[in-house]
Amino acid sequence: ALVEKLFDAARYNVISATGINPPNLQGIWGATMTPPWSGDYTTNGNLPVVVSHYLQANTPELMLPLFDRLEAYMEDFKVNARELFNCQGIHVPSRFSSHGLNNHFDATWPMTFWLAGAAWYSLFYYDYYMYTLDKDFLRERALPFMEQAALFYEDFLKEGNDGKYIFNPSYSPENNPANSSSQACVNATMDVMAANGLLRSVIEASQILGVNQ
């Protein structure tokens, strides 16, 4: 009974906080003009945790404002990839609000090095398709976003001496590698797994639609 109440409470909060925009850090309950962290969209943890509830709660329509916001910032995401990493495709920053440019630079939190954003959000696109089986959505919205995310890795990844691809620089949000004073690292597990999930999903989606063969 307790777990059911917790689920229902979370579902109520998420539905209430979602409108034409996805829920930000404080939802609609900030009650101040200066909320913590500016009440932004923290994309490297907070926002994905919230939107991951949508499909489980049988509210797939609430995913659409997230996709609308991401697609509105596609040109900014392309600027991030090109100007910061000299790569094709898109780079979703660790935070955004009124634009999608990656301008959060900090000596302690190397958020610029977080690579998993576009890949992680691509998985939400593919999850939405798997839940709804909407092939028009897969063709017109999901796969184009996923392809742009994959293009980034085509340029970014370099092959190491052992034949394996290297993610460098890399960053797992708010995690310090062992025996290191810096959170910046090489081959953060989060970055590797996000790219793995993205590329597998691109292959599956392409097979479903009969494209990219």
Residue positions per predicted region:
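Loop/turn elements at helix/coil->beta-strand transitions in domains of secreted/extracellular proteins
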Residues: 2, 9, 59, 134, ...
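Extended, well-ordered alpha-helical scaffold segments
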Residues: 6-9, 62-73, 137-153, 198, ...
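The feature captures the catalytic groove of carbohydrate-active enzymes
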Residues: 24-40, 88-140, 154-213
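Glycine-rich (often Gly-Gly/Gly-Pro-rich) flexible segments and glycine-rich loop motifs
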Residues: 42-84, 187-205, 210-211
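Extended, hydrophobic/aromatic-rich amphipathic alpha-helical segments that build helical scaffolds
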Residues: 3-17, 118-127, 143-153
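Structural recognition of the beta-strand scaffold that forms the well-ordered cores
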Residues: 5-6, 13-15, 52-53, 61-65, ...
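Acidic/polar, glycine-enriched structural segments that form the non-catalytic walls/loops
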Residues: 1-41, 59-64, 70-80, 210
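Alpha-helical support elements that line or immediately flank enzyme active sites
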Residues: 13-16, 47-61, 115, 119-135
